[in-house]
Amino acid sequence: MLKIAFATGDGTAVDQHFGWCRRFDVYEVGPEGSHLFETRLLEAASDDEQDKIESRLAAVTDCVILNIGDIGGTAAAKVVKAKIHPVKVAKGTSVEDLLTRYVRDAGRDPPPLVRKVLKAREPQPAAQSWTRSVAAELKGDAA
């Protein structure tokens, strides 16, 4: 099952800008159907652009797809970097209609951008992780 987030004011339509959204409904979606996993409520957006983006991003980090009414360039780049595929839809698009499409498509090959996100989220084999950490230490980049 994939987790898919919807920026919604009322739970029925995608109608919120990512940076100002105070509610994300997260659904689990698979070929058998979908169900509401969780409604995530956030505080009013901060005036600080970084804080605003980070708090919204933290609310959806476990999701593969993020449906929003609008999103700024900086926020979109951070969402993509977090391995989440942002989908900008027309404001007022029905959450149910989108879920119907996601369920229908769940048994098929995902679109290339979603496939890329899923591949990026796959756990790396231990040897690859180890090789990267050793290389970082040799360069002096150890975390």
From Swiss-Prot:
Transmembrane segments: none
UniProt GO MF annotations: metal cluster binding
Keywords linked to the UniProt accession: Nitrogen fixation
One matching Pfam family: Nitro_FeMo-Co
Disulfide feature: none
GO biological process, one term: nitrogen fixation
NCBIfam families, A to Z: nifX
Family: Belongs to the NifX/NifY family.
Protein name: Protein NifX
Provenance organism: Frankia alni
Lineage: Bacteria, Bacillati, Actinomycetota, Actinomycetes, Frankiales
